[in-house]
Amino acid sequence: MNKKPLAIFLMGPTASGKTDLAIALRQTLPVEVISVDSALIYKGMDIGTAKPSKAELELAPHRLIDILDPSESYSAMNFREDALREMAEITASGRIPLLVGGTMLYYKALLEGLSPLPSADPEIRAEIEAKAEQIGWSGLHRELLAIDPIAGKRINPNDSQRINRALEVFYITGKTMTELTAQQGDSLPYNVLQFAIAPQDRAVLHQRIEQRFYKMMELGFQQEVEKLRARSDLHKDLPSIRCVGYRQMWEYLDGDISLDEAIYKGICATRQLAKRQITWLRGWNSEITWLDSLDPTSSKLKMIEKIAQNSIKL
């Protein structure tokens, strides 16, 4: 039986030092970096996403950044397909894929595969919405309870979006959302070493986030969002503009809040994102080696030692 090739996950909350550590590893190990970040995929969104600088990218080129226009959408399934392709290319060249980022849903999709849920069907969605106008979303929720009791109990009767999706899946496939999500996708054909980096003191992370946000403002974050807002095809409901920081700055430019409020809300939203990322990592089912952001040298050595223990020739 062929031995699975090695892949490395370097996960962690925003502002935890993932990029710096990835660059350090790139100077030592035969690795190629793949970004695992739902914001870095967008072109023209450099400052607010803390995208690696030109100098950093010269030291450690990142795959899967700047691959989409902000008007486009991107799913976990899209990421899995793209990442697997990039990983295969890297492995074929005799190097090791190093996947770096904080979008935990992408890691989960890559590691475990995806349930075979169908793509959205605009016609069926329109039919469901027309029916909702007749009997209300509460009526459709009762219909969902009859079709898929488990999903119906989990979904709030006022959550029209999720009710619509659950019914849409059933109308398209003839199977319930519960049935389909129980079907696991293909697992990742790699021997994966998983690392997570974060400061042991949460207050340090909060301080880093605040400092980084003010630094982004100095670098021209407001002007970056102004440029995006000047485009007629972009609006605040797009996934790209819903990224933390961008949404709050957009609200300021719309005149809904003051600049100070936008900065404060942006910092708070980023801290909340970091909290969700850490919570997800704490509940991660797979084995993770934790690294301390405040000791990057030790973190690098710890990763190298772990890789060596797995009989990988460096």
Swiss-Prot record:
Annotated positions binding ATP: 12-19
Site (Interaction with substrate tRNA): 103, 125
Positions bound to substrate: 14-19
Cofactor(s) listed in the protein's UniProt record: Mg(2+)
Interaction with substrate tRNA: region residues: 37-40, 161-165, 242-247, 275-282
Alphabetical UniProt keywords: ATP-binding, Magnesium, Nucleotide-binding, Transferase, tRNA processing
Domain of life: Bacteria
Molecular function, one GO term: tRNA dimethylallyltransferase activity
GO biological process, alphabetically ordered: tRNA modification
EC number(s) recorded for this UniProt protein: 2.5.1.75
HAMAP family to which the protein is assigned, alphabetical: IPP_trans (MF_00185)
Subunit structure: Monomer.
Name under which the protein is recorded: tRNA dimethylallyltransferase
